Design a protein with these regions (language model features):
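Amphipathic alpha-helical linker/stalk segments
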Residues: 1-16
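Alpha-helical DNA-contacting segments of helix-turn-helix folds
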Residues: 1-5, 38, 51
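Amphipathic alpha-helical packing segments from all-alpha helical-bundle domains
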Residues: 14-33, 42-69, 76-80, 107-118
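Primarily hydrophobic membrane-targeting regions of prokaryotic envelope proteins
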Residues: 18, 36, 93-95
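Short helix-capping/turn signature of helix-turn-helix
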Residues: 36-41, 85
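Amphipathic C-terminal alpha-helical segment
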Residues: 61, 79-100, 115-120
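Short, well-ordered coil loops that connect the C-terminus of an alpha-helix to the N-terminus
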Residues: 69-72, 100
Length: 120
């Protein structure tokens, strides 16, 4: 599972988003079920914690050019924004709850991430 995510191209927002959406199309329902159980099952909570740490580091690596030149609070805030935009719940909201197509979900994420690029 992580091998597929690790194949995301560094610095290529559209490519990284396509990789991520592909991952969520395949694994998203499973991840959402796990997240729904994390408060009740210790081993699931541990697995989810590992996944959260992995996702943070994936964002730092994959979107490194968007983080270059930022330090301290600004870097943490930008990373947190990227983590939120690329979270499985964001995919679920756009794809499942709001009914966007896969292509429109990808376009929306690319556009939103692009907004962070110009942020101070």
């Amino acid at each position: 599972v992580m091998r597929q995510r690790d194949a995301a191209p560094v610095g290529d927002v559209a490519g990284a988003v396509a990789n991520l959406v592909e991952h969520y199309e395949r694994w998203g329902p499973n991840r959402l079920r796990m997240l729904a159980q994390e408060d009740r099952i210790a081993v699931v909570a541990e697995t989810v914690a590992v996944g959260r740490r992995y996702h943070w580091s994936w964002v730092e690596r994959t979107f490194a050019p968007l983080l270059d030149g930022l330090g301290g609070t600004a870097r943490k805030r930008r990373t947190a924004g990227l983590v939120a935009l690329t979270d499985v719940y964001t995919w679920k909201l756009l794809r499942r709850d709001l009914g966007l197509s896969r292509a429109d979900t990808e376009r929306t994420l690319v556009e939103l991430i692009g907004k962070l690029e110009g942020a101070p």
